């Protein structure tokens, strides 16, 4: 069973976060590696700039954006398998910087991983 959570980079770190993986294409402004408390940065698993720019948080494009992002993930099995490997060993927290806590690529990535590789408790972020 996979335990994958999501959390904004601005939320406090917690020992219960497990492995903290930054899943943003750009490093968050104003953060050092120590301040962010990340264990890994997987920018290759994030949506490409072209897709991000096309979507630009236009919710009317959300469904197509998600389909295109999932297709990109299907074509990147190495990065996906790396996350799965770690999630099989313990909790993984996907870190993202966007302000939108409901519609973001980290929640899409979590949904993709769980739909392909296993279900977990529906809680999205750490308490």
What are the roles of these predicted feature ranges?
Residues 1-127:
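Residues lining hydrophobic/aromatic ligand-binding pockets adjacent to catalytic sites
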